[in-house]
């Protein structure tokens, strides 16, 4: 069955009926539509004019061959930059060998509809220049494989930052690292007045560096962390989910942890003063290591293998016999 005429970036709930009664339902959000008001160009044109780009730029990439993003710095005149995968067949392939940062004041960088493979043991965003900044980062509807981290901030002129990761699958986080991975956000080298991170409708599958790591590591500044409708699978019990997050307001809802284990906080000094939990779940064989959340969570009466029988192949489709009430976390796997 195909449903047409749906608006972009809109949440819908579809119901299936049998004999006049609801037998199943699924809630989903449609993908973001291509924004307007940008100078749109191909990747080839963008490369040819890279150092002279300015204003609001949308790089439209289509076809099956994909492209290699090897630029380290965004031109100082660019205020907004979007990498947009435009294919009727799904995501457009993109390889990276170097993380990208800004040489000037860049308000926003976005990645949409891309199948990103890291070939350089790097991060998607790597801001390493004190003369520039990226104030807002958005990654949606992407598959990201073998990357060392998503956002790494070593230097920045901005006093605030916002990061949104939505509708993504991140596989093999830190798999190629010879030491630690950089997680979803590493900003411990910069002090920002505020920091906001939202991760939603996303799965992080197999996330293990060669040494102990943190998924969210900041520098003590206030702000918010929101984790919603996510699944974390095959983590390392020596890793910490949050570090230096005492002054953050953390909200976790409908999120599942399976296979392996993790320390919710790096140490007692990292425990968030304000922690809101509304639907935090773990498989029966997953371990939350001390220091724990300090909030109630639900241990499902099923092992990780029972929940995800094909998890070893990085397919987290729920087992056919998993009851509906245990099909929590990222709903893309509730098929």
Residue spans of the language-model regions?
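Surface-exposed, short loops/turns at beta-strand junctions within beta-sandwich domains
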Residues: 3-10
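Extracellular fibronectin type III
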Residues: 8, 19-34
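N-terminal "mature head" segments of proteins
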Residues: 37-41, 329-332
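Short strand-loop junctions, especially beta-strand C-caps/beta-turns
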Residues: 12, 62-64, 154
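Extracellular recognition modules
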Residues: 13-17
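N-terminal extracellular ligand-recognition/capping segment immediately after the signal peptide
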Residues: 41-48, 54-80, 86-99
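Extracellular beta-rich repeat passengers
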Residues: 73-74, 79-315, 320-323, 330-335
């Amino acid at each position: 069955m195909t449903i047409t005429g749906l608006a972009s970036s809109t949440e819908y709930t579809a119901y299936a009926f049998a004999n006049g009664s609801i037998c199943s339902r699924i809630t989903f959000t449609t993908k973001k539509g291509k924004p307007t008001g940008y100078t749109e160009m191909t990747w080839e044109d963008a490369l040819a004019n890279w150092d002279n780009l300015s204003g609001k730029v949308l790089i439209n990439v289509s076809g099956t061959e994909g492209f290699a993003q090897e630029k380290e710095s965004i031109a100082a005149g660019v205020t907004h930059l979007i990498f947009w995968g435009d294919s009727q067949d799904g995501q457009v392939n993109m390889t990276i060998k170097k993380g990208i940062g800004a040489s000037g004041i860049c308000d926003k960088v976005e990645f949409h509809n891309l199948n990103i493979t890291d070939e350089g043991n790097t991060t998607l965003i790597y801001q390493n220049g004190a003369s520039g900044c990226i104030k807002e980062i958005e990654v949606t509807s992407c598959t990201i494989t073998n990357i060392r981290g998503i956002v790494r901030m070593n230097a920045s002129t901005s006093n605030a930052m916002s990061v949104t990761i939505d509708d993504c699958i991140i596989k093999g986080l830190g798999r190629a690292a010879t030491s630690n991975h950089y997680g979803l956000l590493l900003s411990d080298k910069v002090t920002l007045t505020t920091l906001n991170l939202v991760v939603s409708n996303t799965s992080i599958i197999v996330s293990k560096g060669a040494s102990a790591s943190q998924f969210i590591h900041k520098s003590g500044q206030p702000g918010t962390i929101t984790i919603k409708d996510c699944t974390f699978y095959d983590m390392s019990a020596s890793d910490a989910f949050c570090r230096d997050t005492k002054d953050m307001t953390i909200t976790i809802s409908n999120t599942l942890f399976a296979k392996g284990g993790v320390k919710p906080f790096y140490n007692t000094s990292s425990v968030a003063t304000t922690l809101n939990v509304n639907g935090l779940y773990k498989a029966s064989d997953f371990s939350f290591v001390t220091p724990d959340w300090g909030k109630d969570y639900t241990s499902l009466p099923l092992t990780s293998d029972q929940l995800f029988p094909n998890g070893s192949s990085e397919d987290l489709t729920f087992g056919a016999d998993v009851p509906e009430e245990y099909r929590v976390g990222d709903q893309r796997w509730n098929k």
